[in-house]
Amino acid sequence: MRPLAEFPLAPRNRIRGVLFDIDDTLTTDGRLTAAAYAAMENLHGARLLVIPITGRPAGWCDHIARMWPVDAVVGENGAFYFRYDPAARKMLRRYAAGSEQRAAGRERLAAVRDRILQEVPGCAVAADQNYREADLAIDYCEDVPRLPPEAVAKIVALMQHAGLTAKVSSIHVNGWFGGYDKLTMTRTVMHECFGIDLNARRDEFAFAGDSPNDAPMFAFFPHAVGVANIREFSGQLTASPAYVTQAASGAGFCELVDFLLAAR
């Protein structure tokens, strides 16, 4: 990972949009700061596409799509995208799986949840679980004392043994049935909503993230950026971003936005 200052001017000038994780990338210690929200506003005002790519639940993403200065949101690690059309007063919701498949998946996830809670002391079902459509979120440090890496690894192993795709974020371990991830639904929203083939135009977008569940995005985007706290996951990343900010969390996101807008 190179310092953000080494991101050359010419490719920065070609950036058309910024995609970003929310927890501990946009937020700081669980809070959305005024500066980070203003950074999103500044991107939107500069007519760049602004799209959070998050593990947070459908209930949150409905609010985000409606009320934040964003063009769409990908949620639950790629389970769906939401895009709000204010002129039509209509929310477009696109899921990776149909409603019946999601309902069946939730029943199967309940059994996995119960086993994890029994076998991994100290973990908990994430506080936002009731607002989820497609995945199981196990809290390992958001509202519980931080669990050791061995406990997090056991949660992942139990999910995988049950046939789930499992990803570790900075606060949760998320598990779901299906082969999708953040990148697959990002490709879908870009094609369906904006007519963009990301395979051909990936160099027109920056992605910012901070944890292992962002690895598919780090691997795909040549202009991927980690906020400084990504170093906490060194050795756990299957792919690393090209650049890293000096500042952590939301301040690192602001650093990236200022750096990109200064090139315009």
Residues of each region from the PLM?
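Active-site phosphate-binding/coordination module
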Residues: 31-128
